[in-house]
């Protein structure tokens, strides 16, 4: 992760599909490596990155301090963070917030359009319309795609046209069954655990999944689905 196989200074633009750190997390490294161009993302993605990239930088710096304390005692080499808070702050200044379905001219002959991917607040599929020799062709990069009928998030939308599609395939090797009733399922687990006097631990991604869990907890509480435990949650 420390060495990039290309020169960031040679990049003209960055197009970001969404804020999850496995997609956005190396942007400060690009800036630290010399990238000075604009970073295009939806408005919601930009706002989330204002939180997540600074948090990621803080974690990088904290880990470096911890490792260097150990290295100093053992005579090991100095550990340098992947990037710093200052790098993240510089990167955030290069973001350009964009709206869904409004084409943006990047340069002569190239425009970009963001379409709601239904994966996370602000997530998008990206369409690049490239005109050369009087012929326009459209390349669509799907980004991470969400399912339909999820709470809190819009359904994914299809780009209007495409000559070429580059698509993610996280669940491409399986068929999903009928969507479970998450409220009923979670209520049963909570009820059984509380009745035994136990505690419930639910590991969850901080951005996206945790908000859905809070939404389910709210439904369970408002509908008073947990019996005999008045202090839930």
Q: PLM features: what roles do these ranges have?
A:
Residues 232-233:
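Extended, well-ordered alpha-helical scaffold/bundle regions in very large, multi-domain proteins
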Residues 1-15, 20-24, 29-212, 218-227:
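His/Asp/Glu-rich metal-coordinating catalytic cores
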């Amino acid at each position: 992760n420390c060495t990039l196989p290309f020169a960031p200074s040679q990049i003209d633009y960055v197009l970001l599909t969404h804020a999850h750190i496995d997609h956005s997390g190396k942007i400060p490294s690009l800036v630290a490596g010399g990238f000075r161009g604009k970073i295009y993302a939806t408005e919601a993605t930009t706002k989330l990155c204002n939180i997540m990239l600074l948090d990621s930088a803080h974690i990088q710096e904290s880990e470096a301090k911890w490792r260097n304390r150990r290295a100093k005692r053992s005579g090991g080499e100095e550990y340098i963070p992947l990037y710093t808070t200052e790098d993240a702050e510089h990167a955030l200044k290069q973001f350009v917030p964009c709206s869904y379905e409004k084409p943006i001219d990047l340069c002569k002959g190239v425009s970009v359009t963001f379409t709601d991917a239904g994966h996370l607040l602000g997530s998008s599929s990206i369409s690049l319309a490239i005109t050369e020799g009087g012929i326009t062709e459209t390349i669509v990069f799907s980004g991470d795609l969400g399912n339909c009928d999820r709470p809190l998030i819009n359904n994914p939308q299809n780009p209007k046209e495409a000559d070429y599609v580059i698509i993610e395939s996280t669940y491409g090797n399986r068929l999903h069954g009928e969507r479970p009733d998450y409220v009923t399922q979670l209520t049963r687990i909570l009820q059984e655990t509380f009745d035994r006097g136990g505690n419930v631990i639910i590991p969850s991604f901080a951005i996206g999944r945790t908000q859905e869990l809070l939404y389910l907890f709210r439904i369970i509480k408002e509908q008073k689905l947990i019996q005999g435990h008045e202090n839930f949650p």
